[in-house]
Amino acid sequence: MFHLKRPNRFETDWRSLNRIDHDDYARSGYDRGHNAPNYAMSRLNGRAGQADSFLMTNISPQRPNFNQKFWQRLEEVEITFFAPNFGKVWVITGPIFGQNSQRLSTSWRVEVPTAFYKIYVTEPTPTRPMAALAFVVPQTVKGKEPLTQFVTRIKDVEAQTGLNFLVDLDDKTETDLEGTIDVASWQLNAVNKTLPRYR
């Protein structure tokens, strides 16, 4: 699919209570960081997907080194390596807030996460069982760290977020996937030191 031109502004989501605006982030020192990436959403769902990716409800405040380096690397790996190698890959992602997290200096309505998580889950095939891989990445990263440095268990993501993942799976599969770190199945070492696009 052709690449769609990137919009100049993010749009307020009328469905949200706080109605966060593009300008709430102006001069805050934080990027408007995508949770679901524009590249993947526009590639899979065209203009409608891109429009959804530029809603402010898909945005979290991210430090530049986090957003433009480490997170960009991980997003690129998921679309250019995980998806082609493992077929359909489910991605669960979001912010993690600390006990004493701050708010943007430019808008009290926007809380700043201390870290972000990503969980990848493959669908099983006749030759390959379901696999899962989880990351928790602090905002303080410099950007070029090995991806494996931040691999964790899904159960640890649950402990930090208070969320319960993979609830539709049978109990044994859920327990196995959530309690295991499985780097080998994902061939993560092949892309472990992928360089950021923005250096």
Tell where the protein language model's regions lie, with residue ranges.
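Domain-level detector of nuclease and nuclease-like folds
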Residues: 14-199
